[in-house]
Structures are given as structure tokens and as C-alpha cells.
Amino acid sequence: VQEPRKWTAETPELYTLGLELSNPAGLQKDKIETVIGFKKTEIKDGVFYLNGIPLKVNAQNSHMQHPEEGHVMDEATIRKDFELLKQFNFNAVRTSHYPPVNKYLELANEYGLYIIDEVGDEAHASEWISSLPEYEEMYRERCRRMVLRDRNHPCVLFWSAGNESGEGINITHTIEEGKSLDPTRFWMYGGNAFSHPAEDIIGPRYPTPMELEMQVGIGEDSRPSFMDEYLSVAGNAGGALDDYWEAIYRHPRLIGGAIWDFVSPGLTERIRQVDDLSPFHTPAHLMGNARLVKEGKNTVLDLNGHDQWVEVYRADNVELNSNELTLTCRIYPRKLVSSCGSVSYT
């Protein structure tokens, strides 16, 4: 291909590569096909370029997590995720904190999403084994498996040497191993320090907009910067997004960042409803893993007071005119199959 159409998130141009195995007589014995793309990444004067153009990366972190199937995401779910990401103007995903299934990368090639592909060596900042020589080969082996499998996917923008696994020499070994197998891509590392000496693309993670401005925008480290995690959107968080991106657009060395995170990982649990026999009919649910226990001749509902409780949601049709509320509960264990009891207000 003399002048290939370049692959980007905006123009996901793909080509089919076919390989045939023939015997000396010219008879075909085997044939395989795969999809590839052409692109080129560079770092010049601290700026990250894709196909000769400075690139800004607006990413999300995402676990391989399904509410019904656990760590198994079917194609329909992946497509739904990618369509939502594209709809809201995200152009990248950091696969926290391990390589995704192969179908994930195939669809990223198709949809046009940059992937920051991550080695699965997380120690989550509690057991740092990256300085121990007996773990070096494990770091290298996990890196090899990822790079050898994924290096032909055009969606892989750059690699990550892992997440929160300390700052030891094994991180350097991981990056060395990866570069020996794929010299065309750059490396970052999701550590909790500002940067690691071996990475091509530095952090920080979770800076304030002012810290991002001071540490990177006018800092002395000349490497490009990517916030592999920032703006943790738990609960009602997510403020100051515009402040971050004003800094990112103001300084060419700032590539962008990956918001934590796209989908909160969790499994669907059965919620048992509690009937409100008062005139208010307020929604309430039995939460946790409360159990029925024998108490003398009776069977009662045991709530331990920590992770088991009856949760009563605020209802607009309930008006309280004082600082006191009396809650009366009447429990009928035989109804636990469909409803776990009754709640009445007095």
C-alpha cells in the first residue's frame, strides 16, 4: 500500500490483510484474514502527534464489567458502550486495569476509538512488588501477552505499564519488554507518583486544574502529559471539567485525560420491596442480606445495623412539620417471597 488512508478516531479506515500458506506445488493449504489500519504516532518537542497532527485525547476509564454476566461483556454491550461514548464526544478508552477481550479492540477499530491498552499488573497501592526481582518475569510475561496479541490493532494509541503497582524497577522492565516487541508505540504508567523515569508520557493523576497548570503546563519535565485518571465522577462529582480542558487546550504538551469512570462496576442484586400501609405509600426496600432467625417460638427478621437495613426513600407526598418522626414496622415473615413486611408512619 503506497499511500494508505490513515486510521484515526474520526476516520477509522481499515484494510483487510490476508495470508495464504501454500505447498511447493502451489496448492493452498491454509488461509487467514485480519483487519489492520495505518497510523503514525510521534512525540516532538513534548507534543504528541498522530499522523502529523497534535492530538487531544478525551477518554474514559472502563472496566470489563457486566451487571448480569460479571467480567464477561457481550458484543451488544460493547457496541452500546461505544455508541454512548461517541455520542458524548469521547474519543478514547483506558482499559483499566487489564487488556480487554479481543472483540473490544475489533469494535474499537470499527467505531473509531483510541485505546490505551494496560498491562494487568495492578497491586492497587497496597502491596508494591515492583521492586522485587522475583516478580520481574511476571511483569514481563503479562506485558508480552498483551503486546503480542494487540499490537496489530490500529485502535491501540499507546500502552500503559499497569496501575498502582509501585514505582520500582519492574515497571522499567515492563516498558523495556513492550518496546522490544512494538517499537512503534509509546508508554505511560498509571502510578500514583507524578511520573516514572521509564515512561514516555507522564501523569499526573487526580490533579486540580491549578496543579495541572503548575506541574505540567509550566513545569520542567518536557514529556507530554496524560491524566490517566481524573475527575472521579462518583455521586454528584464531575465539576470543573471546563477548567481542566481550558488548561489542556492552552498547553500543547497536555494530551488530555481519562475520567474515572465510565460505568461503575457492580452486579445486579434482587431488591425486596417493603409495603407502606400508611396513606403515603412511600417506596421502601429491604437492603443488604438480612436473614430470618429463630427467636423463641417465633421467626424474626434480623438486621445487624451495619450493612442490612430498611431504606425509605423521600417521597414528595409526605410532609413533615416537626423534627420528630415515628416509624412503626410490622414484619410478616411469610410474605418475604414477594414483600418483606410492612411499614407504617405515626
Placement of each model-derived feature along the sequence:
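Extracytoplasmic/periplasmic beta-strand context in beta-sandwich domains
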Residues: 13, 32-34, 46, 185, ...
